[in-house]
Amino acid sequence: MPAAPLAEAPFSPNPGNLRMFRYLPKGLKAGAPLVVVLHGCGQTASGYDTGAGWCELAAELGFAVLAPEQKAANNPNTCFDWFNPEDITRGQGECASIAAMIRAVVDTHRLDARRVFITGLSAGGAMTAAMLATYPELFAGGAIIAGLPFGAAANVRDALETMRSAPLKAPQQWGDAVRAAAGYAGPWPKISIWHGALDTTVNVNNAQASVAQWADVHGLALGAAKQEMADGAIRLSWGDQLEVYTIPVLSHGTPIDSRDVGRPAPFILDVGISSSRRIARFWGLAPLAASRSAPRPAPVRAATPQEPALPEIEAVLAPRLTPHPGAETLIRRALKAVGLLKR
């Protein structure tokens, strides 16, 4: 049964001038978890939720959904401003607005403040990383889909270059950016990272940088990862603290399995693996979906999304290969091991 639609609700303070939508399944009990869902560029809160299926999962599993929405007045492409220092600094801008929404929903509906999770796609994935860095005490877990590491950009020019290839930094440098954002010493949220190998909008080495960042924050050795195949994706995991899915047939978007929850749409790509359900499982909200006998759909490739558009700047930014030692090596080794990358 389709979930009820997201409903807009007031909140304050709102220094980032965002809108707040939330969904509370019928009969939701006090002490339920909360999942915060951040849309990508050119999307709306409800449109992204329909595609990714979070409200469907909420109705099934018994958690609340909070879906912030960007305004065109802030960003003409309705991207969250993950590259603007005024919006990704603790106590300021869009991050402060999202934190205020979380506190309002948790307090008003008596949700479990110890089980708040956040996920997002593309610009929403980058803003997810920003929230996890600037307000880590609010979250038990996060999931970054086709996103970027925190601290990768401080202006539009940086953002465009980073989307092409993440800056080359040592894992400790990436980790230091997170540790400095809130002056927080832990415990840290568990992190799930998802990226398509065919993504030409946000280079997959941003996933490698995100792995390096959060492995360093958690004090994990990159070489200690467990490797497995999962519905055509390559999964590397470090216990219950960190995981990364690399999907060979995925371009830029959120991967879904339409036989489960969600619906295909622009940048919601039906490639036979439900990221939403697997993320919920990693967070401890759901068991893994039962296997299905239906044939896997053909891979869907998406057009270039509406990212911050500055053609005159983009034209002069040459692509740069900036590998991330350790994280990149692990992912490339995994691809080779299953025959998806030539030796």
Short names for language-model regions:
Residues 1-34, 46-53, 60, 64, ...:
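A domain-start/cap signature at the N-terminus of enzymes
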Residues 37-40, 67:
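Structural cue for short, hydrophobic secondary-structure segments
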Residues 39, 120-122, 196:
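Conserved alpha/beta-hydrolase "nucleophile elbow" surrounding the catalytic nucleophile
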Residues 40-44, 250:
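Active-site glycine-rich loops that stabilize anionic/oxyanionic intermediates
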Residues 69-93:
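Cap/lid segment of the alpha/beta-hydrolase catalytic domain
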Residues 86-109, 130:
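Alpha/beta-hydrolase active-site loop
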Residues 106-108, 113-184, 200:
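Primarily recognizes the serine-hydrolase "nucleophile elbow" in alpha/beta-hydrolase
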Residues 193-195, 199:
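Short beta-strand/loop motif that positions the catalytic acidic residue
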